[in-house]
């Protein structure tokens, strides 16, 4: 990818001459879609990023959000970040995914925080295809290797399979960091005369041009031709960098910081000084390297991993070098900050190779004004399938099957904060410093947003909010990773615009500020574009660290809240469902609750009540899959659903309208009272010790023992 003619003319007009080779490469990368958001930034103003809890919102390496404290708890902040490593994970699934983890962890470090939790949201082609399974295995291995080695637990996430990811999988990784308020730093340069210090791994040639590579469609030969653009990670160096960063903060040696990610040293250093309104003079010869004969462009743009650039006061430079040596990390004093109004200058072998205004380099790219086509609306055209066949196919589909094969590879209890483990609706982390439980949910459903981008994205936000509420937490803040195909195609851009608006509207309705995020476009290949995919990572807060489990106790009554179709008030729709993915057909997307905020807040309140023995949200696969996930060898369930004027048994059991939760409770009347005027409460039956699941709808019955259900749900384990 090279600088376009129009961009080249703009650069020449601004700087008054032809750019040097190094300058042209910098503009090419920093003005790429990956860095400049040229096609997406005009849409992102739809998001509400403000709130009393927001300390630092979008624009930095990670967002900073304050937590409520309980009891004798202290004031604490968390950082939230998310990034994509999509193209690299197709070319090299292990290293592509591993370095995605490393990058988002360093974004956390650059705010002064210590990383305490990861979430991975993964999207692949049809599970039946060998190439999809190869990518799946490699990505999971890369994430588990890197996360386990650095001691950061992967506690939640999602996995989805869809034909349209065959030529371009998605790997979205989110990180939560814990931060004492007084340790907060930013990526905004502070003071002329301060030094720029590069700490971490030596610089090589890996990852060259990674930002521009991520801004193009994947070519047919990408797995071989684009391998040099994929970074190679070293988690052991990352662990040392994490601890070195803590030591630097302990001694208050850091004025500002930036992770070296997209566009490498050139991107990190120019962005840092631009945010501070300063200039800089950098000597590229001073960069510690691991390969000989590197040129200026390679020093600037290599995306070698495990590197940070720090702003350090001159009197503190020697101490920073001592601490870096203690942790066996390289350290180079590469330059210094200069007065406002001066340029970003880089020299190499005594010659000036870059001399430009950092603000123009970082923010001068013109935005794209692209046409968009609204996605077509789908109408009902559904096949007739027996209830047993539908249940077995859907419960055993990779999208609804157990993901234990994935999360059992992760060390999800390191740091001893995880009180609700992977496999539940949301993870729950004990923030003992504040006396606060932090619920964490992340994911999206491509079936939803493929069928209806706007409505599906609203459902993604509601589902993640319902996940944390089902564990008794109130939604607090979110970050998003917006993935789309080639925005130059009007139908693709129309779908992308739909997910942006849908996610923004529902988060606003829920009063959840979207405090940061990432955009990944050009996820397109010879197989076509991906479905528009709005990954959301959302946290909720509660007092204490206990939550009702997903699994039944076998001792209570079962109720579902928010299921208006079972009450005969709405038409159950199968649009975007696993039912239509398995059997074909189309339908409209489910209508969502009118007042989602009241529903979610009441779910959180009820989930924390003493009479609640278990809780589980209803979403992927519908009510039947939710019940199948709740039964186990020690507890079964008997469910009977009466006749309604709306919906066949299949539509009642397999529609995926979010905002519903199944509670096992010893006091159904208390649940009904809590939801009076908020959402309907429908009694389903009882949990018991029958070792089976019986569901009767309109005189049709499903009857399975839990061993058979476990066998159906083990398809990923069985295959891999």
Curated annotation (Swiss-Prot):
Active site: 34, 85
Catalytic activity, EC: 6.3.5.3
Gene Ontology CC terms: cytoplasm
Pathways involved: Purine metabolism; IMP biosynthesis via de novo pathway; 5-amino-1-(5-phospho-D-ribosyl)imidazole from N(2)-formyl-N(1)-(5-phospho-D-ribosyl)glycinamide: step 1/2
Binding site for ATP: 37, 480, 517
Reactions catalysed according to its record: N(2)-formyl-N(1)-(5-phospho-beta-D-ribosyl)glycinamide + L-glutamine + ATP + H2O = 2-formamido-N(1)-(5-O-phospho-beta-D-ribosyl)acetamidine + L-glutamate + ADP + phosphate + H(+)
Annotated GO MF terms: ATP binding; magnesium ion binding; phosphoribosylformylglycinamidine synthase activity
Compartments, as annotated in UniProt: Cytoplasm
Alphabetized InterPro entries for the sequence: PRibForGlyAmidine_synth_PurL, PurL_linker, PurM-like_C_dom, PurM-like_C_sf, PurM-like_N, PurM-like_N_sf
Positions contributing to Mg(2+) 1 binding: 83, 518
Assembly, per entry: Monomer. Part of the FGAM synthase complex composed of 1 PurL, 1 PurQ and 2 PurS subunits.
Similarity-based family: Belongs to the FGAMS family.
Protein's UniProt name: Phosphoribosylformylglycinamidine synthase subunit PurL
UniProt organism field: Haloarcula marismortui (strain ATCC 43049 / DSM 3752 / JCM 8966 / VKM B-1809) (Halobacterium marismortui)
